Amino acid sequence: MSSDFKRPLLILSLAIVAAGAAIHLDSSGPPTFRAAALKAPQAPQTEDQPELLRAFAALEPIDSHVHAFKNDPEITDLMERLRLHILDICVADAHSIYGSLDTETARAKAFIQASRGHARLCVTFDPYSFHQKDFAQKTVELISREFAEGAIAVKIWKNIGMEVKTPDGRYVMPDDPAFQPIYRAIAKNNKTLVAHVAEPWSCWQPPNPDSPDYDYYKENPQWYMYMHPDHPRKEVILAARDHLLAENPKLRVVGAHLGSMETDVDDIAKRFDRYPNFAVDTAARMEYLMIQPREKVRNFLIKYHTRVLYGTDLEFLPDESVADALKDWQETYARDWKFLATNATFQYRGRQVQGLDLPAPVVREIFHENAVRWIPGIDSSPKQAVIEP
């Protein structure tokens, strides 16, 4: 362990809390994946986990991207110990491992009810029925009922743009006019749209074992667009997402998974500059921040300190053991804290990574304040993002 990292992390976390959230700072083709650090043997990083988690918990962290569809008091106890709040997100997936959408939503609601106030609901809708005449009306009625019962956000998923088609075979994009009444209803109710649109660039590239997503596409070939050249290109899907943002300036949109602009933070920055109603979460894409140049990522997170929400994409599924979930959740939170809040050097998936050691107020905003701003209702704070006209 480096001498820099030996300073007590609890002191660091208290400094972050004291600093508060206010910080005033200025705000041609797919890239090929390149490792930005030397490969090294993987080593377990568990000896400092309790200290890391104590520092993490001091911020009352918010994980804005979780899929929890099973109850267990040990998970609830963990959330209490970590002072953790989560957004439990439902997904409308024809290939779902979560069960039918109704079953999935019921399980999420049961988890939230048992969470002792530590979880809130992000609902979704069935996009495969979008061609039906009353689709928009029924969907608006559905999400309005869910809002009345406590849901605070709505998700659209990557099947919009990559799988859902019209009866005549046209791929449906996220800016399709059929969705406009739904987006207007979300904005009118002061809720947030969580948009998982498109996929990492590796989805359209030849297989590369060095890619962070190699195993996912190996196990889920239906989403590996390199093998489906007749499907829309990523550029087309992201352009439709950008049009959605432009057409709905009063709609708060959180782009899941770094907004599918994971390989270069400059691409995210361009959207932030163009669309004040847009933020991103880090769910399942922290590794992409680790492999980009350290100072570039650090400067990006400092400059756009109010626009990046902490998220993980952690799961707790009906067939998963609580022991496995506890291990995964704690390891993920400890590792992400180490990367964002310290300058420690550590091994992750065979790469040597140095922590970003972000300023204390920026760390607090990423782990807590930004979720409060962009997803009102995720805790009891009245703060929310103000979208300028």
Identify what each model region corresponds to.
Residues 39, 229, 234-243, 247-389:
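H/E-rich (His + Asp/Glu) clusters that bind or coordinate divalent metals
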Residues 44, 52-54, 102-224, 276-279, ...:
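Active-site gating/metal-coordination segments in enzymes
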Residues 2-14:
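N-terminal Sec-pathway targeting helices
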Residues 62-66, 86-89, 119-123, 154-156, ...:
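Hydrophobic faces of well-ordered beta-strands that scaffold small-molecule active sites
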Residues 34-39, 58, 82-85, 118, ...:
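Active-site gating loops and adjacent loop-to-helix segments of metal-dependent hydrolytic enzymes
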Residues 23-118, 137-138:
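An N-terminally biased module of ancient metal coordination in phosphate/nucleic-acid-related enzymes
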Residues 12-26:
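Hydrophobic alpha-helical membrane-insertion segments, chiefly the h-region
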Residues 65-73, 93-104, 128-137, 164, ...:
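Acidic-and-aromatic substrate-binding clefts and catalytic sites of carbohydrate-active enzymes
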